């Protein structure tokens, strides 16, 4: 009977909750259980899942909280009636960059769990350090400077590891940790990422790190497929490179590797089968691109408070402003990522200014913003001879490019490539509605243009499809402008998986790892089973001949504008 077929669990261990999502072989979701850290945990004085030490800009989570959460989610699935004996494979997604420090007795404690007690009761003593740094932590500026310098500069670090140094990345965090707590570091037997920590709990021994998530450390040389020894030496300091290598462990290349059977604790406590396999867990961003069969050169744009752009690509072209990771399942592909701080908040500022001008200051409706965006011609050009209106709108400091908060407006003439900072001809705030969406999308196109290929005869390089997720994906005007600028020969689609993308991606990864035929890629297996009509809706046209090319000219002006503003700001300091 189909109803007795195999099931697969995908976990998502994020900052504020642990989620367990169960799918069958046909990728249909049959159960979801959540454990909200603030609402459901006992004994932790956390806020939004974390603790803070503002004096040192530290943000971290108690690891014991996650132990409590895993039992909590599994209890929730049991109450929903999940038949654990049908679960054939488990994978997971973890908040990226966070590290867990295991003590000398970790393996013994993991291997000797008693099903009559909770994980928290038995494993709280398994860690040399009780906390895990969170991605919001900003305590490592000194260490980041050292990481950026050790290979010759941020460009060289990005070339080797896929990213320049970032506060949240695991390498700078480990360097600071071994300096701040040398005795604790010495007694640390192993270091896990949040993703491999989750897999370790399920396996009953320390799991290896995942081939994609390891790229979020500033330690893994992506080109060489090995840890970078110069970076390990810096990170390990007086304790030595070989000691750190042992702490980190080997990294298998196969994202679908069978790590081993589930630990006896879960068989006895919850009724899992002794044949249930544990698969590598990956990071939350890599898991997101597994929530659908994302083809090479397809793009995902997450339009939340911040903006995240994800693309699967065969090209490895790192830059200090971007991130590259190994693809979590498919050798020869990479995940390209852009992260912006100014996303939805910046658009809301313009929306509110427009509503106030039109006499409804308390309104949070997007109706006026959308209407004006669609009524305004591309780049504010009423005729071809008019200059293009370009701007940067940053209510909070930005990282791409690295600029203070502020607003800058320019007029650009593509015929003679002249760029003038000016409010002339700008009717604010109305002109800013389209200009802010264009500004955000032009930045994405500028930074991803070297990674796209032509999807067909006489069509310029661009994504095949653009998938929008997050709150902004509900906005038809944003979708239309996204298609005009980014292209998408097959159109612009809204991906509607709620906030389940990471857990779904992890569950799909488990299905693929357990049911693939030899050599079968994730994209092929999931592509055959994924019911497109249930998850996506075409919401805008993509490539439009003439309009796309016009925005290609605007990208040149946009790049000039960024350089000019950066130079002006450098001169001010």
Swiss-Prot record:
Keywords, in A-Z order:
ATP-binding, Carbohydrate metabolism, Cytoplasm, Kinase, Nucleotide-binding, Transferase, Xylose metabolism
Spell out the reaction equation it catalyses. Answer: D-xylulose + ATP = D-xylulose 5-phosphate + ADP + H(+)
Task: Report the record's Gene Ontology biological process terms.
Answer: D-xylose metabolic process; xylulose metabolic process
Q: Which InterPro entries does its entry note? A: ATPase_NBD, D-XK_euk, FGGY_C, FGGY_N
> What superkingdom does the record give?
Eukaryota
Positions bound to ATP: 366, 471-472, 475
Q: Where in the cell is it found?
A: Cytoplasm
Indicate where this protein is primarily found: cytoplasm
Q: Tell me which PANTHER family the record gives.
A: SUGAR KINASE, XYLULOSE KINASE
Q: In its UniProt entry, what is this protein called?
A: Probable D-xylulose kinase A
């Amino acid at each position: 009977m189909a109803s007795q077929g195999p099931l697969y669990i995908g976990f998502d261990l994020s900052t504020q909750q642990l989620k367990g999502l169960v799918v069958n072989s046909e990728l249909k979701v049959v159960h979801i259980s959540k454990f909200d850290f603030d609402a459901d945990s006992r004994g932790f004085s956390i806020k939004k899942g974390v603790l803070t030490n503002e004096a040192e800009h530290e943000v971290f989570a108690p690891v014991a909280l996650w132990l409590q959460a895993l039992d909590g989610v599994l209890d929730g699935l049991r109450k929903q009636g999940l038949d654990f004996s049908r679960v054939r494979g488990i994978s997971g997604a973890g908040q990226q960059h966070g590290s867990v420090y295991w003590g000398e007795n970790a393996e013994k404690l993991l291997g000797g769990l008693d099903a009559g007690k909770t994980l928290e009761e038995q494993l709280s003593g398994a860690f040399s350090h009780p906390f895990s740094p969170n991605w919001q932590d900003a305590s490592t500026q000194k260490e980041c400077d050292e990481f950026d310098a050790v290979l010759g500069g941020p460009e060289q670090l990005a070339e080797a590891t896929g990213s320049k140094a970032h506060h949240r990345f695991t390498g700078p965090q480990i360097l600071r940790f071994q300096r701040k707590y040398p005795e604790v570091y010495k007694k640390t037997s192993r270091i896990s990422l949040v993703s491999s920590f989750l897999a370790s709990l399920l396996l009953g021994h320390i799991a290896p790190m995942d081939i994609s998530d390891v790229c979020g450390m500033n330690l893994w040389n992506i080109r060489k497929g090995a840890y970078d020894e110069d970076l390990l030496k810096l990170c390990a300091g007086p304790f030595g490179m070989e000691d750190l290598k042992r702490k980190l462990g080997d990294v298998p290349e196969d994202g679908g590797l069978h790590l081993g059977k589930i630990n006896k604790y879960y068989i006895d406590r919850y009724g899992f089968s002794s044949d249930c396999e544990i698969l590598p867990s990956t990071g939350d961003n890599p898991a997101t691109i597994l929530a659908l069969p994302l083809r090479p050169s397809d793009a995902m744009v997450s339009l939340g408070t911040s903006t995240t752009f994800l693309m699967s690509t065969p090209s490895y072209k790192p830059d200090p402003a971007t991130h590259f990771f190994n693809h979590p399942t498919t050798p020869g592909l990479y995940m390209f990522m852009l992260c912006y701080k100014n996303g939805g908040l910046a658009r809301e500022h313009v929306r509110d200014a427009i509503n106030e001008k039109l006499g409804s200051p308390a309104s949070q409706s997007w109706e006026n913003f959308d209407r004006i965006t669609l009524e305004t011609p591309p780049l504010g050009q009423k005729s071809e001879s008019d200059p293009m209106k370009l701007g940067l709108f940053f209510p909070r400091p930005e990282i791409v490019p690295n600029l203070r908060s502020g607003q800058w407006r320019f007029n650009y003439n593509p015929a003679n490539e002249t760029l003038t900072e000016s409010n002339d001809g700008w009717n604010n705030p109305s002109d800013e509605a389209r200009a802010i969406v264009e500004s955000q999308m032009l930045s994405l196109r500028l930074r991803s243009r070297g990674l796209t290929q032509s999807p067909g005869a006489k069509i310029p390089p661009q994504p095949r499809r653009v998938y929008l997720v997050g709150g902004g994906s509900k906005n038809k005007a944003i979708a239309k402008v996204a298609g005009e600028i980014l292209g998408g020969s097959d159109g612009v689609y809204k991906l509607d998986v709620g906030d389940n993308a990471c857990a779904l991606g992890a569950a799909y990864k488990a299905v693929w790892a357990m049911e693939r035929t030899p050599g079968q890629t994730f994209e092929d297996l999931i592509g055959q089973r994924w019911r497109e009509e249930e998850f996506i809706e075409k919401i805008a046209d993509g490539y439009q001949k003439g309009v796309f090319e016009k925005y290609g000219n605007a990208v040149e002006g946009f790049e000039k504008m960024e350089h000019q503003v950066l130079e002006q700001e450098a001169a001010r300091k």
